[in-house]
Amino acid sequence: VTTPLLPPPITAVAAVDTTLRERGHGVLDPAGLHQCLGAPAHALDAWWGYWDRLAPDLHLRDGGHYRQRRHGGFIVDGARLTAAPHRAHWQPLEYNALHGGIERWFEPLEPGLVAEPLWPSLLLWLASRASALRGVQPWFIEAHPFRIDTAGGIGRPTPEGAHRDGVDLVAVMLVRRTGVKGGETRVFDADGPAGLRFTMSQPWTTLLLDDER
């Protein structure tokens, strides 16, 4: 018996900023994200190949080999997007008890991905959402393409468990699901028992989170 997936509550494009302010989170469906980027339907599917060429995550403290990723940083100042020098990813222990407190170096993003026409559109749009939430200012964006491989049994997208990232805004985008069971997303209030659970199943479904909440 297959348990049906619980779909996410979809946020209307016009209500994204209001929903983030009022609830601390919102979910765009694929059509909504493409609309926000001014792109035709399925345009982002051209990015799928980059997720076939991610590098092994060598920093998993649970001894696993199920996660591949790359990493890149960008600065958005107004309408200007600049690639930052490649650097380590670092989180304090208070936000990530398993992987915090160490410099984690990952392979950089492929130049081809950064050169994709919709790449700056996505990052500038996300920076605009952060400015709507916190006020207009320059933003530093870290991009983390992930791939979780379940071929060996169990893959853990977040082996550190429920945690905050210590940033202003988090965007979680589902690129694709292939041969995967589970993969449930859970959103928790930082200071209370309230929460939300659902499964993103359609490519380019996007969860936006006010990380402080």
Stretch-by-stretch model annotation:
Residues P157-T158, V170, L174, P203:
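Short, hydrophobic/aromatic alpha-helical segments in well-folded domains
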Residues P145-R147, M173-V175, D189:
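Short, structured patches in soluble enzyme cores that scaffold and shape functional sites
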Residues R164-V180:
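Short, conserved beta-strand element in jelly-roll/cupin
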Residues V27, P145, V170-V172, T206-L208:
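Conserved hydrophobic/aromatic beta-strand scaffold that supports enzyme active sites
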Residues P145-R164:
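Conserved short histidine dyad/triad with adjacent acidic residue
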Residues G153-T158, K181-V187:
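A short secondary-structure junction signal
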Residues T2-A143, A151-I154, A190-M200:
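Fe(II)/2-oxoglutarate oxygenase catalytic core
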